[in-house]
């Protein structure tokens, strides 16, 4: 608790609040993603706080992967630049970073290294090259039976 400054962005706040209203709204978002077995994912609140604070640069939240300025207004949740939390290691809430919705959807259940490899191979195709199919990761969820959402 800092008393009069937001621990994320440094904006003035009131005692005993640790985060300003804007940052608190982001930190308190309800997790709707599900794990491989269909259960709701657990949120690592401390990791999310670190990720959000780490993404704050030059007066804005920035995407971990692209550095672009993110949109935090919930009414614009369908925008590709909307701020979301993303696990660098799928299912590991402690590895969470702040990213844009588009990158999060593209990365989905890939690790950071797998994502970089796929994007690099895709760029080769865009430049007239050939995609190396060896870049596809093994199927991490093969044999996993998903429960339908409750």
Task: Give the residues covered by each predicted segment.
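BZIP DNA-binding basic region
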Residues: 1-29
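Short metal-coordination and nucleic-acid-contact micro-motifs, chiefly zinc-binding Cys/His arrays
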Residues: 2-5, 16, 55-61, 93-96
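Short Cys/His-rich Zn2+-coordinating modules
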Residues: 2-7, 38-53, 80-87
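Short Cys/His-rich "knuckle" micro-motifs
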Residues: 14-19, 73-76, 108-112
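Short cysteine/histidine-rich metal-coordination sites, predominantly Zn2+-binding motifs
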Residues: 21-27, 77-91, 114-122
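Short, charged surface segments at domain edges that flank catalytic/cofactor-binding sites
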Residues: 26-62
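Histidine-centered nuclease catalytic patch
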Residues: 48-50, 61-102, 107
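A detector for short metal-coordination/catalytic motifs
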Residues: 93-150
């Amino acid at each position: 608790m800092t008393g009069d400054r937001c621990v994320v962005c440094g904006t003035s706040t009131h005692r005993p609040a640790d985060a300003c209203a804007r940052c608190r709204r982001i930190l308190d978002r309800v997790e709707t993603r599900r794990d491989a077995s269909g259960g709701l994912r657990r949120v690592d609140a401390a990791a999310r706080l670190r990720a959000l604070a780490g993404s704050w640069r030059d007066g804005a939240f920035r995407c971990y992967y692209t550095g672009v300025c993110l949109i935090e207004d919930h009414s614009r949740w369908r925008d590709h630049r909307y701020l979301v939390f993303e696990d660098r290691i799928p299912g590991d809430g402690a590895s969470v970073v702040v990213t844009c919705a588009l990158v999060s959807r593209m990365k989905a259940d890939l690790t950071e290294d797998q994502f970089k490899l796929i994007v690099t191979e895709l760029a080769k195709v865009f430049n007239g090259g050939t995609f190396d199919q060896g870049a596809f990761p093994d199927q991490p969820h093969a044999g996993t039976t998903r429960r339908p959402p409750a």
